[in-house]
Amino acid sequence: MSNDKIIVALDVPDTESAIALIDKLESVTFWKVGLELFTSSGPRILEVLKSRQKRIFLDLKFHDIPNTVAGACRAAAGYGVDLMTIHATSGRDALKAAKEAVEEGAAQAGVKPPKLIAVTVLTSISARQLALDLKIPSELPEYALDMALMAQEMGLDGAVCSPQEVAHLRQICGDDFVLVCPGVRPTWAEAGDQKRSLTPSQAIQAGADYLVIGRPITAAAEPELAWKRISQELTTVV
């Protein structure tokens, strides 16, 4: 199993911290840039990653009215990233507009369109929170599936889901639908605020295409060793 299945979350506050981590973990090929770092650094961090021939998951989780989402996706697609996200709860019209805008933005910039991935349910949300806080009566696995199927119907390339839903989504959505799993925790790492996690090997065996792993690697006393341990774990997965 290739370690390019692992996307390491570059969840640091500024460009300088990001560069230090990128250079420390030279063998990492795929990095996630999220809200904190992109808000702090802007497109500069994407240029840093591209200059080092790294793949990029731009995880900004757009969630707004269709016109606004489309504009943001059109701009983001021009950066030449590999994956980007939108909340499925933005609705059908926004999802459709976003997908069309991604194609337009990439064409205008002369780059390959990124895969547009829908966030189903944040991995920090429990079934209890879904029911009590968000007032959604569906069972969490079925709600995640409904969001993924809506995204697939609107032409999106895949979905973000917890490892606990990935097997069900893989069975229903098929092999060509890209499934990205955050909330992955090795047995030796703390769960933190992740409510619905599995180990890296369990998530891949369940059907995940990519794993997003942050703190178990980046906050480890020895990040290089943590990265190697997880990579080694995945070599046993067929």
Swiss-Prot record:
Pathway field: Pyrimidine metabolism; UMP biosynthesis via de novo pathway; UMP from orotate: step 2/2
Fetch the Gene3D superfamilies from UniProt: Aldolase class I (3.20.20.70)
What UniProt keywords apply to this chain's record, in alphabetical order? Decarboxylase, Lyase, Pyrimidine biosynthesis
EC supergroup of this enzyme: lyase
What's the protein called, per UniProt? Orotidine 5'-phosphate decarboxylase
Q: Organism source for this protein?
A: Nostoc sp. (strain PCC 7120 / SAG 25.82 / UTEX 2576)
Q: Per the record's keyword annotation, is Lyase included, yes or no?
A: yes
PANTHER family named among the record's database cross-references: OROTIDINE 5'-PHOSPHATE DECARBOXYLASE
